[in-house]
């Protein structure tokens, strides 16, 4: 079982983090962190201003900290099972990943600093060699026969994709894995 967590609209999605994870048969608490989908950051509108990215970060931290408190009260670890930020300027294809890399770096560092409380995290989403069918288009919705890019069919393909050649993002992940592996060493 996975849970997005309360999201900014818990009554809309009918999520209650404590109730959803309170069962003795659930071993850990899960949340998602989606600043763009939740209206905390619009890389296209802001052109990725540092101020707007910082707002997204602060909103994410407040959201995570609230989930950490619930997880601690349930004596269960927290897993951020999905966290994401689009490519710079909201591009689905091409474009740099400097904003996303900065956000991911902060996310990994912040969560790794909470051993015993935060057990892990997963980014969204691996596309590898997959690409939207029209690389020149701003937004391409999946259709049968299209490559899988990690994004669900109803969302723009490549929106949140990490491609095989996104070397700087891969470096962020390598550092993140290293930070979390320290948890195992006590």
Locations of regions flagged by a protein language model:
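Extracellular glycoside hydrolase catalytic/binding regions
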Residues: 1-117
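Aromatic-rich peripheral "rim/lid" segments of glycoside hydrolase catalytic domains that contact
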Residues: 18-25, 59, 91-106, 110-186
């Amino acid at each position: 079982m996975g849970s997005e967590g309360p999201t900014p609209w818990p009554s809309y999605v009918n999520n209650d983090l404590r109730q959803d994870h309170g069962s003795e048969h659930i071993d850990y608490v899960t949340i998602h962190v989606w600043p763009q989908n939740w209206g905390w950051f619009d890389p296209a509108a802001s052109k990725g201003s540092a101020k707007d990215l910082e707002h997204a970060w602060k909103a994410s931290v407040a959201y995570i900290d609230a989930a950490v408190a619930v997880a601690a009260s349930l004596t269960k670890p927290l897993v951020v099972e999905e966290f994401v930020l689009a490519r710079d300027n909201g591009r689905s294809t091409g474009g740099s990943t400097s904003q996303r890399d900065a956000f991911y770096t902060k996310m990994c560092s912040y969560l790794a600093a909470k051993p015993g409380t935060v057990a892990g995290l997963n980014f969204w989403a691996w596309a590898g060699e997959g690409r939207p069918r029209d690389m020149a288009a701003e937004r391409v919705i999946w259709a049968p026969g299209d490559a899988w890019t990690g994004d669900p069919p109803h969302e723009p393909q490549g929106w949140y994709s990490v491609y095989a050649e996104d070397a700087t993002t891969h470096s962020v992940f390598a550092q993140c894995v290293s930070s979390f592996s320290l948890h195992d060493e006590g």
